[in-house]
């Protein structure tokens, strides 16, 4: 059985959307929500890097794709949560206890991912000269 064929940008956008969907569900711990928020932002950043033709390294350290985006002349959206705080969920809190005092709210996680999504969708559309790349994945 064959399905639609997607390019790397589209695959990363699809995977980011899957991680973002977890934030809207119920029953997940704060660590899991933070992890999926971090993963969504990471994949969105890497989708934009792919769109501008930059090969990204496989790392969960969000500062690295951010640095590559800045070097490529791209910007980051202003978000309620800094990348450094999200980064903790990909590494430290996957294997350690998350103190309640450092836990961002679900609202902050959703807003941060949503701002990145909107930013990346807009940039991919502008850079490709067409909404087709984004529309192919948002219609799934």
Go through the PLM ranges and name each one:
Residues 1-140:
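Terminal alpha-helical segments
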């Amino acid at each position: 059985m064959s399905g639609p064929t997607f390019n790397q940008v589209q695959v990363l956008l699809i995977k980011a959307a899957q991680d973002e969907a977890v934030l809207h569900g119920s029953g997940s711990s704060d660590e899991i929500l933070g992890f999926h928020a971090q993963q969504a932002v990471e994949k969105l950043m890497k989708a934009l890097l792919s769109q501008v033709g930059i090969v990204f390294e496989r790392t969960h350290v969000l500062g690295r794709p951010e640095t590559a985006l800045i070097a490529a002349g791209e910007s980051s959206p202003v978000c309620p949560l800094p990348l450094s705080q999200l980064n903790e969920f990909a590494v430290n809190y996957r294997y350690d206890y998350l103190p309640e005092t450092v836990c961002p709210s679900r609202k902050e996680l959703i807003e941060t991912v949503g701002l990145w999504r909107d930013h990346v969708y807009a940039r991919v559309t502008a850079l490709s000269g067409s909404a087709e790349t984004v529309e192919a994945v948002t219609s799934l």
